[in-house]
Amino acid sequence: MNTERTLVLIKPDGVRRGLIGEIISRFERKGLKIKALKMLRLTREKAEEFYSVHRGKPFFVSLIEFMTSGPIIAMILEGDMAISVVRRMIGPTDGREAPPGTIRGDYSLSKSQNVVHASDSPESAMREIRVIFKDDEIIDW
């Protein structure tokens, strides 16, 4: 077994549309363990730090504006190959191309407002978790 941790964000559009419970339930039904969970509102500084890999890209400013437009849900999920499992569950970035049955395929109609974010590699997961969570917010059980 290859136990991994990954970070998932339910973005402001997912929170506004009341999709929190549905999205969390999908991950739980898959057998992923929630190690940390909180609602927060990203500051501009925290959003820029989180999405620093996209700094300088044409969509960076609008991404930061969107991610700071309302509350988000942040969670750490753990399980066997959690990063790739979660990425398959959420579907491609562009919700218009995501197949039905994926979170984005079922709930997203665009590339920019695509309901969820999930870490794409072990390195990204470690960095993103450190940006959003303090060590004492992560529960081992």
Swiss-Prot record:
The lineage of its organism: Archaea, Thermoproteota, Thermoprotei, Desulfurococcales, Desulfurococcaceae. Transmembrane segments: none annotated. Its cofactor is Mg(2+). Its main location: cytoplasm. It comes from Staphylothermus marinus (strain ATCC 43588 / DSM 3639 / JCM 9404 / F1). One of its GO terms (biological process) is GTP biosynthetic process. Pfam families: NDK (PF00334). The keyword Signal does not apply. Belongs to the NDK family. Its EC number is 2.7.4.6. This is Nucleoside diphosphate kinase. It is an enzyme of class 2 (transferase). Major role in the synthesis of nucleoside triphosphates other than ATP. The ATP gamma phosphate is transferred to the NDP beta phosphate via a ping-pong mechanism, using a phosphorylated active-site intermediate. The active site is at residue 117. It catalyses: a 2'-deoxyribonucleoside 5'-diphosphate + ATP = a 2'-deoxyribonucleoside 5'-triphosphate + ADP; a ribonucleoside 5'-diphosphate + ATP = a ribonucleoside 5'-triphosphate + ADP. It is found in: Cytoplasm.
